[in-house]
Amino acid sequence: WVNPTPFSQSYYAWSCAAVKAADDLKYVFPGRWSIGHDYDVPLEPWPVDRNGRDLSWYRNNATPGSKSYFTVGERADFYGGWYETSDAGFGHWSRYEDMPGRKVWIWDLSRSGEIWVDLLTDRDGQYTEPQAGRLLNQSDHGDFAPGSADRWREQWFPYRGIGPMVQASPHAVLNAAREGASLRLGLFALRPVAEDLVVSAAGTELHRERVVLRAEQIWKKDIDLAGAAPDAPLEVRLGDKLVHATAPGSDDLERPLRFSAPTGGSAEALYLQGRGLERERRLSEALDKYLAAIAAEPLHVRALARAAELRTRAGEPARALDLAGRALAVSMYDPEANYVYGVAARRLGRLVDAKETLGWAARSPQFKGVALVQSAEIAILEKDYERAAESAYAALTGDNHNVNALEVLAVACRLLGRKREHHRVLGWLSDQDPLDHLARFERYLLGRKPRDREACRALVRGELPHETWIEMAAFYHRLGL
């Protein structure tokens, strides 16, 4: 995922699926608490609510209104569901730090929810939505840093024949149920597996055997726990492919989970309110908050820098320069203020000032990549192609996924006549972003071959293809080409 602009953008990413709603559906959603949309309810116990209802069963949600449950309070890489009658289920896996958000959406079980069966879904009855997100709640928006690229991995999967999952990985789904002096295990392979399965109690190995499975193969076994204390914590380990611990609360979070928006009229509160509005793309309201924060505290460097960026985005670089300059008068080496000053100065044609302040910004890990790309673009404007290539390579040392740096580097290599290097950079760019149209257009510009031109044109298939061409034209215009 790429933010190709020189400005901070709203960060909002959720992956949503639809599955069949049924009375025997059990949601396997790790968590101790749930919250609703817009934090319309405080933290509520999950899965059993304050009235003793186990809300993880679809049938127990027959109370007025549609339901959104965002489950929090437990660190887990997986979640999903299980149908009791068919002993089949579904799941989602990603590293928790990549996608900590877990949500289930349930339409009202009354007639007001049933209308959506005909309006939204297929002909197989009502549906419900498991969803995975980069943040904990869909009311939250993050920051997508200027010029940055982000990537993560997630996997949706089916499973069957083992009962409800208690753990999952990209390799297998596990069910584990302790029944007296034995542990009933079930594995469903998501891909070929050949690993030692080890069961331990309180750190002592009780059972080990080789498990070899093909994709979708089921393995079941009852493991004798003789010698283990009834309350001993158990661990099931499938090589380095899956680990499950039964110790109660082993993955519970103790950190505070307070979901609230800042209030009050202090400079810091106004600044934080502005940040929230900016993340929601309510830019004019955000600017008003930043200006109010500056009025309350004229030396608030972060508010000055954010207001300067929004002035630049609004096409007012001169006013932006004044605000960023005031921030630099307070903190000369502030990375954000230097970066915003450099972007605004470039738009005003003050390239010496732009290069100087972007150079200071590039010393900060936060702005290194994007500031160096801006410097590389200025170097191309000034026909200093060697310096442009050096700046682009420097940007890539900190982030070799930097698509903007690769695009500028490709242009610099072409203008320097370095055909082999140009070809290598285009391959690098295509590996990072196979849908990057500029890579194919650059290949055409180097050789001017009709087949390369047609290859580029043939893959511009978006709903608004003219916008793709306009964006590419704007890129070359920024470089003075």
Question: Which residues fall in each region the model found?
Answer:
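Alpha-helical repeat scaffolds
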Residues: 320-327, 354-360, 386-394, 419-431, ...
